[in-house]
C-alpha cells in the first residue's frame, strides 16, 4: 500500500514472528530475574573457600541486581543507537563471559567484578531490548504477551535454583559457574531472533551526520515532563521499597514462628507456583475489551491487594495461615509482574518506551537498594518481623492508592482542558496545536502531556479517519530509533 494507506499494514503484527519474539522474551526475563537469586545457592561454598561472611558473599547477587536495574539508561542509549539485536548479542556474550571468568576467581573482589558487574550488565542489555521488541510486535494482544513473558521469572527461578544445587554438589561452585556461563549463551540465541517487525522504511534524519536532533533521541529525558510518566515513576519507587521484602524474609519468618525448615522452604514454592499461573492469567484478563482501558486501575488494585495481604498476614503464626498468605501474595505479586510494563507501554507509547523504561529501572534500582537492606537491618535491630511486614505492606498499598487517585485526577484534568479548548478555540485550535508540535525538536507522542488519557483509547484502528496520518508516523519512529539499523541491513 502507499504511504497514505491505512495503518493496519504498518502496525504491530500481533502474531506471526511475534510469537518467536515472545518465546525469546520469556527466556530472557527468566534469566534476568531468576539468575541473581539462583546464584545464591553457591554462597555456602563461597563462604568456606574465601573465609567470608554471608553479607560479603551476598554482594555478588546485590551487584548483579544493581547492574540489571541501574544500567537502564545506558541500555536505552545503546538500543536507540545500534538496535535491539546487536545489543542483545553483545549482552549475551558479556553475561556468559562474566560467569566463565568468575569460575577462575581467587578473591571475592574478582567475583564482584565478573559475576556481579559483567554478568549483571549483560543481563541488563538483554532484558530491556527484549521488552522493547515485544512492544513492537504486539498491540491488541500486548497484555497477554506481557503476562506470558513475565511468567519466565518464576518458571526459571524454580528451575535454576535446583539446577545450581545439583551442579554445586557434583562439580563445585567453580564448575557450576562455568556451566551457568554456557547456559547464558542462550541469550545470544534469543537476541538473534529479534528482527525488526515489518513496516514502512525508516525515515532519514534531516540533520547532517545525525546532528543534535539525533543525539537528543538517544535518551529522551523529555519524557520526564509527562505527568503520567511521573505518576508511574513515583508509584514504582514506592512499590519497590516494600514489594520484595516479604518474599526475602518469608522463610526466616516462618522458622521464627516454629515452622520446620523443610516446610518453611516449601512456602516459597507455593508463591512461585501461584505466580506462574497468575501472570499469564492476569495478562489475558487485562487484554479483554472492557478491562484494557482501565489497566492502570487494575494495576493499582493489584498493588493494593499485595499491600493489604502483607498487613493482614503480619501476625500469622500457624502454618495454615502462612500458606494462605503465600497464595494471596503469589496471586497479587503475579498480577503486579504481569501489568507493570503493560501500563508503562500504554502510558508513554512505543516511540518513548526505550527511554522511559531505562529511567524507570534506574529509579527502581535506588528503591531496591534502600528497601530490602533496610528491612534486614531493622530485623537485626528489633528482632521482630511483624513491624517489617507492616512497613512493607504500607508502602505497597500506598503505591496502589497513589496510582489510582493520581490517574483519576490526571484523566479528569485532561478531559476538562480538552473540552475547554474545543469550546473556545473553534477551528483554529488544531492548527495552533499542530504548529506547536512541529516546532519541537523531537516528536515524542501524539498525546497531550497528560498521556494517561491515551489509555482510554488503546485501539488505534478504531480511531477517526482524520487521525490516521498521525498514527502512521509512530511505527516509523519505532523502526528508526530501535530497529532501523537492522532493517537497513536486511534491505541491503
UniProtKB/Swiss-Prot annotation:
Official protein name in the record: Monocarboxylate transporter 3
Residue ranges that the UniProt entry lists as topological domain Cytoplasmic: 1-14, 80-85, 137-146, 194-228, 279-293, 340-352, 408-492
Catalyzed reaction equations: (S)-lactate(in) + H(+)(in) = (S)-lactate(out) + H(+)(out)
GO cellular component: apical plasma membrane; basolateral plasma membrane
Segments on the Extracellular side according to the record's topology features: 36-58, 107-115, 168-172, 250-257, 315-318, 374-386
Family: Belongs to the major facilitator superfamily. Monocarboxylate porter (TC 2.A.1.13) family.
Predominant place of localization: membrane
Entry comment, domain topic: The two basolateral sorting signals (BLSS) in C-terminal cytoplasmic tails direct SLC16A8 to the basolateral membrane.
Residue ranges, compositional bias (Basic and acidic residues): 476-492
Region (Disordered): 419-492
Function of the protein: Probable retinal pigment epithelium (RPE)-specific proton-coupled L-lactate transporter. May facilitate transport of lactate and H(+) out of the retina and could therefore play an essential role in maintenance of metabolic and ionic homeostasis of the outer retina.
Xref: CDD domains: MFS_MCT3_4
Any one GO molecular function term: lactate transmembrane transporter activity
Amino acid at each position: 500500500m502507499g504511504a497514505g494507506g491505512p495503518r493496519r499494514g504498518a502496525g504491530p503484527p500481533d502474531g506471526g514472528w511475534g510469537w518467536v519474539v515472545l518465546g525469546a522474551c520469556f527466556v530472557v526475563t527468566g534469566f534476568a530475574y531468576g539468575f541473581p537469586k539462583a546464584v545464591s545457592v553457591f554462597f555456602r561454598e563461597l563462604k568456606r573457600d574465601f573465609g567470608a561472611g554471608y553479607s560479603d558473599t551476598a554482594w555478588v547477587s546485590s551487584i548483579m541486581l544493581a547492574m540489571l536495574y541501574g544500567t537502564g539508561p545506558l541500555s536505552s542509549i545503546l538500543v536507540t543507537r545500534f538496535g535491539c539485536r546487536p545489543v542483545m548479542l553483545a549482552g549475551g556474550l558479556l553475561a556468559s563471559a562474566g560467569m566463565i571468568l568468575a569460575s577462575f576467581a581467587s578473591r571475592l573482589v574478582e567475583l564482584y567484578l565478573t559475576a556481579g558487574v559483567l554478568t549483571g550488565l549483560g543481563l541488563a542489555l538483554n532484558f530491556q531490548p527484549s521488552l522493547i521488541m515485544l512492544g513492537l510486535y504486539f498491540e491488541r494482544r500486548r497484555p497477554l504477551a506481557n503476562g506470558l513473558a513475565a511468567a519466565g521469572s518464576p518458571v526459571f527461578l524454580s528451575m535454576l535454583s535446583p539446577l545450581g544445587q545439583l551442579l554445586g554438589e557434583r562439580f563445585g561452585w567453580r564448575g557450576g559457574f562455568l556451566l551457568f556461563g554456557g547456559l547464558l549463551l542462550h541469550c545470544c540465541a534469543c537476541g538473534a531472533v529479534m528482527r525488526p517487525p515489518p513496516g514502512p522504511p525508516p525515515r532519514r534524519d534531516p540533520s547532517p551526520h545525525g546532528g543534535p536532533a539525533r543525539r537528543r533521541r538517544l535518551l529522551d529525558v523529555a519524557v520526564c515532563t509527562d505527568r503520567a510518566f511521573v505518576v508511574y515513576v513515583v508509584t514504582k519507587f514506592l512499590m519497590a521499597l516494600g514489594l520484595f521484602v516479604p518474599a526475602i524474609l518469608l522463610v526466616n519468618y516462618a522458622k521464627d514462628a516454629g515452622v520446620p525448615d523443610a516446610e518453611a522452604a516449601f512456602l516459597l514454592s507455593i508463591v512461585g507456583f501461584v505466580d506462574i499461573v497468575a501472570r499469564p492469567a492476569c495478562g489475558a484478563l487485562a487484554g479483554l475489551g472492557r478491562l484494557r482501558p482501565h489497566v492502570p486501575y487494575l494495576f493499582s488494585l493489584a498493588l493494593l491487594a499485595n499491600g493489604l495481604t502483607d498487613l493482614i498476614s503480619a501476625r500469622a503464626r500457624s502454618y495454615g495461615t502462612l500458606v494462605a498468605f503465600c497464595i494471596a501474595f503469589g496471586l497479587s505479586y503475579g498480577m503486579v509482574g504481569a501489568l507493570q510494563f503493560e501500563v508503562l507501554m500504554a502510558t508513554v507509547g512505543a516511540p518513548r518506551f526505550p527511554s522511559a523504561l531505562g529511567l524507570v529501572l534506574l529509579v527502581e534500582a535506588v528503591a531496591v537498594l534502600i528497601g530490602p537492606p533496610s528491612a534486614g537491618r531493622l530485623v537485626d535491630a528489633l528482632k521482630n518481623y511483624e513491624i517489617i511486614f507492616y512497613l512493607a505492606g504500607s508502602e505497597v498499598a500506598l503505591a496502589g492508592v497513589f496510582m489510582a487517585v493520581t490517574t483519576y485526577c490526571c484523566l479528569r484534568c485532561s478531559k476538562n482542558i480538552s473540552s475547554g479548548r474545543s469550546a473556545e478555540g473553534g477551528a483554529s485550535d488544531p492548527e495552533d496545536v499542530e504548529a506547536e508540535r512541529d516546532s519541537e525538536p523531537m516528536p515524542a507522542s501524539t498525546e497531550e502531556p497528560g498521556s494517561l488519557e491515551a489509555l482510554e483509547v488503546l485501539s488505534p484502528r478504531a480511531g477517526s479517519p482524520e487521525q490516521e496520518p498521525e498514527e502512521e508516523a509512530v511505527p516509523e519512529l519505532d523502526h528508526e530509533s530501535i530497529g532501523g539499523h537492522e532493517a537497513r541491513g536486511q534491505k541491503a
